[in-house]
């Protein structure tokens, strides 16, 4: 009984904290108040600690990793979003937009788990024999980590598309490189007349108030690429470990279960994104559109099967 009471306390504290942190980060986008952004970062760390305590507490009284039902997977997804934020914050000089993306992600998944799911779905139960496998735990944890990173990366791409509307792509992703080259190679014969005119346009543009917007777009593009690259790797590991586990449990590596089919679709979408970035050299709008599509594909893969209530991966939600 004490474990359940402690879980409820930690769930309410962590949700209240992440709600406040979300409001703080959204506020920093409007008002540049000194110290407000750092308060959001500290709040995210406390939220991470509370959610960690909740998951450990549930692990202790259930006797297994808290990854066995939809409630636990949502809480783990919220925890993963806070981990992702903390890791990126260490390397980011301006975390306002980072927090404005990761904090709402953690809040919405946490809120849906605690407020949106029926109480009977929040209870922990005994694992069936097929789930009592180390491959099972590796598979589920890697997949949920990949969901968190892919969703955050896709949200960064969606934010990029919104901010980038009405801004010339070539100006954003070509200006800095051209100006840098001009500074390093100031030979007058190096540039044609048209090139010099182009550089002048870039210089005028970067002298305007749009400079910060360009910087933000490039930063969002960088975050999206890094997050999706990490999420794609985690998704690959999770899918391969799931195939090994499925072969041990059911004698088949791949059975075209609905979630397996959507896993392949998800993997393909983000493989296309990474291909366009690494081999085609695309930046900005084109790969961001692919990543934005991936955002919806991930949610279909994660919740679509549960809404339908079919397949081996269904948690049974909304089943008659």
From Swiss-Prot:
Superkingdom classification of source: Eukaryota
Membrane-protein topology: Multi-pass membrane protein
GO MF, any single term: heme binding
Pfam families: Cytochrom_C_asm (PF01578)
Location in or out of the cell: Plastid, Chloroplast thylakoid membrane
Keyword terms: Chloroplast, Cytochrome c-type biogenesis, Membrane, Plastid, Thylakoid, Transmembrane, Transmembrane helix
GO BP annotations listed: cytochrome complex assembly
Disulfide linkage: none
Regions that span the bilayer: 9-29, 36-56, 70-90, 97-117, 143-163, 227-247, 254-274, 288-308
Any one GO cellular component localisation term in the record: plasma membrane
Coiled coil: none
Functional description taken from the UniProt entry: Required during biogenesis of c-type cytochromes (cytochrome c6 and cytochrome f) at the step of heme attachment.
PANTHER family for the chain: CYTOCHROME B_B6 PROTEIN-RELATED, HEME EXPORTER PROTEIN C
Family (UniProt): Belongs to the CcmF/CycK/Ccl1/NrfE/CcsA family.
Subunit note: May interact with Ccs1.
NCBIfam families the UniProt entry points to: cytochr_II_ccsB (TIGR03144)
Protein name: Cytochrome c biogenesis protein CcsA
Organism: Pinus thunbergii (Japanese black pine)
Organism lineage string: Eukaryota, Viridiplantae, Streptophyta, Embryophyta, Tracheophyta
